[in-house]
Amino acid sequence: KDQAFISKLDGTIALFGAAAKGCVYLNALGSWKLSNTYCVDDTVQKQGKFIPGTEIQVRTRDYLMVDKPDNIIIMAHNFAPTIAQSLINDGYKGRLITMLPEIQIDRA
């Protein structure tokens, strides 16, 4: 269900939050890969590394704001409202998507 939803998204996709629950979720999607996708995390120690078990690199928020993806999937669903508001405050204008516990789409 989640793979089908993500594959139908129009435009570019970035992930936000390289916490353990997001990593487990991405790996649970199986062999399916988000091609040309990156993850953003504000934790400096995670930046420049890859999410375990994937080819998804963790980048900075500055990279995200320059790239301006059409969709941001917020992986840390328990912090989604705070993350969404901070992205809006930073000037993000695309779709904000939370996949867990169920799919929710908001427009920035």
What is each model feature region?
Residues 1-108:
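Hydrophobic, well-ordered beta-alpha structural blocks that scaffold small-molecule cofactor pockets
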